[in-house]
A protein has these predicted regions:
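Short Pro/Gly-enriched beta-strand edge/turn motifs at strand-loop
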Residues: 1-6, 97-101
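Hydrophobic core residues within well-ordered beta-strands of beta-rich domains
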Residues: 16-18, 99, 113
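Catalytic strand-loop segment that frames the active site of acyl-thioester-processing enzymes
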Residues: 14-53
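Conserved positions in beta-strands of structured domains
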Residues: 20-23, 85, 90, 102-106, ...
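Active-site helix/loop of acyl-thioester processing domains in fatty-acid/polyketide metabolism
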Residues: 22, 53-76
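Hydrophobic beta-strand-centered segment that forms part of the acyl-chain substrate-binding groove
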Residues: 65-100, 130-134
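HotDog/MaoC-like acyl-thioester-processing domains
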Residues: 11, 27-31, 93-97, 104-142
C-alpha cells in the first residue's frame, strides 16, 4: 500500500502522515516504512547541528502503523489512542534514515485494540512499545 492508498484509511495528511508504505503479511503483521528526509517540521530545533526525530514522533509512526492493521475496520472511524505502554527507546532516528515498523495486534475486544510495535533502522531496534486505541465513529464534517 502506498501513501495514496494509505490516505483512504488514515485521516492524517501532510505533514502528519508518517507512513510512506505498508504491507500486511500472511500472519497479519503490518510492515511499514517512513523515510526521514530531514525537511520535517519536527526536526527544526531538535537539535541544531544534530537533528534527531523526537520520541513522540517515533511513537506516532508506530501508532499509524498499528492503526493500519485494522484498515478494513477504519472506514468511517477515527483512532483515539488510550495508552502507550512499555515504550523503550534504544537508538536514535536521524535524517536520511528509513524507519521500519513491525506491528502486531495482541488484543481486541469490541472497539478496543492493543498492538505491539517495534521501530527499527537498518535492522537495529530504535523503539518498541505497546499502543492501545479505540475506534470511534468519524463525526467530522467532510
Amino acid at each position: 500500500m502506498n501513501r495514496d492508498e494509505i490516505k483512504q484509511y488514515l485521516p492524517h495528511r501532510e505533514p502528519m502522515l508518517l507512513v510512506d508504505e505498508m504491507n500486511l503479511d500472511e500472519n497479519h503483521v503490518a510492515h511499514s516504512k517512513y523515510h526521514v528526509t530531514g525537511e520535517e517540521f519536527f526536526l527544526q530545533g531538535h537539535f541544531p547541528g544534530e537533528p534527531v526525530v523526537p520520541g513522540v514522533i517515533l511513537c506516532e509512526i508506530m501508532a499509524q502503523s498499528c492503526a493500519l492493521l485494522m484498515k478494513d475496520d477504519l472506514i468511517g472511524k477515527l483512532t483515539f489512542y488510550t495508552g502507550i505502554d512499555k515504550v523503550r527507546f534504544k537508538n536514535s532516528v536521524k535524517p536520511g534514515d528509513t524507519a521500519e515498523v513491525e506491528a502486531t495486534l495482541t488484543y481486541h475486544r469490541a472497539n478496543i485494540y492493543i498492538c505491539s510495535a517495534v521501530l527499527s533502522v537498518n535492522g537495529k531496534m530504535c523503539v518498541k512499545g505497546e499502543l492501545s486505541f479505540a475506534l470511534l465513529p468519524d463525526t467530522r464534517n467532510k
